[in-house]
Amino acid sequence: MSSTGVKTMKDFMLNKSNIRNMCVIAHVDHGKSTLTDSLVTLAGIISNEKAGVARYTDTRPDEQERCITIKSTSISMYYEIEDKEDIPADANGNGFLINLIDSPGHVDFSSEVTAALRVTDGALVVVDCVEGVCVQTETVLRQALTERVKPIVIINKVDRVILELKEEPEEAYQSFCRSIENVNVLISTYKDELLGDVQVSPGEGTVAFGSGLHGWAFTLEKFAKMWSAKFGIDRKRMLEKLWGDNYWDAKAKKWKKNGKGDHGEVLQRGFVQFCFDPITKLFNAIMEGRKADYEKMLTNLQIKLSADDKEKEGKELLKTVMKLWLPAGVTLLEMIVLHLPSPVVAQKYRTSNLYTGPMDDEAAKAMANCDEKGPLMMYVSKMIPTNDKGRFYAFGRVFSGTIRTGGKARICGPNYVPGKKDDCVIKNIQRTMLMMGRYTDPIDECPCGNVIGLVGVDQYLLKSGTITDSVAHIIKDMKFSVSPVVRVAVETKNPSDLPKLVEGMKRLSRSDPLCLCYTEESGEHIVAGAGELHLEVCLKELQEDYCSGVPLIVTEPVVSFRETITEPSRIQCLSKSANNQNRLFMRAFPFPEGLAEDIEAGEIKPDTDFKERAKFLSEKYGWDVDEARKIWCFGPDNCGPNLFVDVTKGIQYLNEVKDSIVNGFNNAMHDGVVCNEQIRGVRINLEDVKLHADAIHRGGAQMIPCARRCCFACVLTGAPSLLEPMYLAEIQCPESAIGGIYTVMSRRRGKIISEEQRPGTPLFNVRAYLPVCESFGFTADLRSHTSGQAFPQCVFDHWQLLNGDVTDATSKVGSIVAAIRKRKGLPEGVPGLDKFYDKL
């Protein structure tokens, strides 16, 4: 297989049944980019020697320096299946176009994974066979299943089991089994009815084993072919015996289920005897330098070494031999082609999850059928910087229709509502580009089922959006598993450079799916990210790429808190409008546990049918059904984890002031009364309203501030407190380092929740909760206390209530409130109730 020209690529793009859109996902350092190299080698893009070392899809200098992937990178390649028996039934010919996206594994960049999953139909999940399924494996797999993306698995770093841990073959089998079982537990936990059962099993060919660094991999299919040809038996029968409790009794010449021979001798299971043993024997012969032994094995395997290769020894020779015998690229590409769906298959069950409009309209039908003649529907999931500073390719997937260079299209942002003109422009597409890792190639048009980059769209979209050619609903915006909770204020050393900073922040906001850039009312310029590393990368980009190297001053990182209440308002709160002609009576209640999380997870949404919503709230949280039907608003921003409920009866003119009251509620929830942080987990009941009969006296200018003040009064009478964000830290270390972990955790208000040894390894898995505000410098601190043996990975987990009185400056929560108020330039001390609560 050679590098394929753009012209040939176009022909493949039309053959929808033979396209595979897939991404590589895993925990950090489990070997995604290294494995991707094996696939890229097959496409003839890098040489065989460089595979596993080049990390071709790590295109940025900082990715090569840090040895981690920061941005997801797309590459298209072509593969032909040689064995006609293996071609899938719905395929059209034996040539396949594979659009692969390599994604980051570090939790701080998991928004990049979400963007990659949105435009793909399948995912290759990489699991380190020593470390097993880790916290980020769980996160990315959950995201994949939420997007209805079908997973297949590769158990990576198998060479470590043989060379480092020197495990017995049976132990290795049990270790692989545990990892596969853990993946299947996650798949069944987050399963989706429409996606169907996507559990993985080596016997079905959906699990491979290999080593990305050494460039080899195999599925059981490979050995089934080899042994069935040798013994002259049916390939499928052989395949069934290579996994599970199947033991070959050579004397009796039959398979047993119990591992004991007729005379009580211990039998080896099929996987060990026919798959793992040959590999282990070859490994040992080469590493121990037993030339006669391994040359005999190579002859049996029909592997011919070149004169140069014969000179090699040890690991170098091992790599060469294994790449020739079990090339990872071929194994993985076959697995991708055979077990991942084409756009034609996948879009049938993915459309209902993606399209926001009715499922029987023209756009939805075209998406479900992947119809290139239907209306254009494309989702832009991220922006990729071009060589032209400050400009971006809009990268996305065409779900129906065909997008053409120079064609007119409607570019709609995530807030577009059909029938309205906001957040939508009609413009020409300047160019369509094939994204090829480090390079791009212009192309005239791109039919549905493919991923593509667009030039000239970046001016009209911030981060993501939908591109159509007719009036249609938009494709649902992405939901990220992390939130930007760590932020810094940025300013320029030289005030005259301020316009460059503002422009740079706009560009940074575009380039990163998650990064938030905004200006506070106090005039501070804020950049917010998911964690310390994410923020560091964003700030480096901001200074070097988007602000032309302007010197910047960056404050210490600050963490976002949330305000809440801990008990119902002790009195009914009354606020009057400025003209004293209107009165609002409200009361606040804290959410029952779990409701805020349900709202954020989308279990109940503002657009859910009100009867369904009421049923859910009454059954799960014991709400009164009538009250649950009268939810006016979720806040802030009409979608947050707070609710405004109308419990009044028969109030005249109430509908006329509804918008103003909702507006006031949203304002109050966005900037809380305690320290201007967002409010979370509060339900506000509107209990009574007295309105002036004349509409001119109850306009927005009167009612919005009145509603806001009343909400604040309710919060102040409900024992207000703060919620701080907590990380779930997963730390892998040997037993000797556990003491150091406890020391660091206790110093940082952390709480260890579990520690367990990974069976068959000397490693311990320690899980702990760590406050985000205590996490700065945590990794360096931990490494210095454990002599560099502990590797932490922190994922945002939940919001934790801080105990104490917010008005008492000597308590922990009081001192945090005082510090936040001082930083924001607010008056000292929490405002008193008399500022918001009016007397009758």
UniProtKB/Swiss-Prot annotation:
The keyword Phosphoprotein applies. GTP binds at residues 26-33, 156-159, 211-213. PROSITE patterns: G_TR_1, G_TR_2. Its EC number is 3.6.5.-. InterPro entries: EFG_II, EFG_III/V, EFG_V-like, EFTu-like_2, G_TR_CS, P-loop_NTPase, Ribosomal_Su5_D2-typ_SF, Ribsml_uS5_D2-typ_fold_subgr. SMART domains: EFG_C, EFG_IV. GO terms for cellular component: cytosol; ribonucleoprotein complex. Phosphorylation by EF-2 kinase completely inactivates EF-2. Belongs to the TRAFAC class translation factor GTPase superfamily. Classic translation factor GTPase family. EF-G/EF-2 subfamily. Catalyzes the GTP-dependent ribosomal translocation step during translation elongation. During this step, the ribosome changes from the pre-translocational (PRE) to the post-translocational (POST) state as the newly formed A-site-bound peptidyl-tRNA and P-site-bound deacylated tRNA move to the P and E sites, respectively. Catalyzes the coordinated movement of the two tRNA molecules, the mRNA and conformational changes in the ribosome. This is Elongation factor 2. It comes from Entamoeba histolytica. The lineage of its organism: Eukaryota, Amoebozoa, Evosea, Archamoebae, Mastigamoebida. The gene is EF-2.
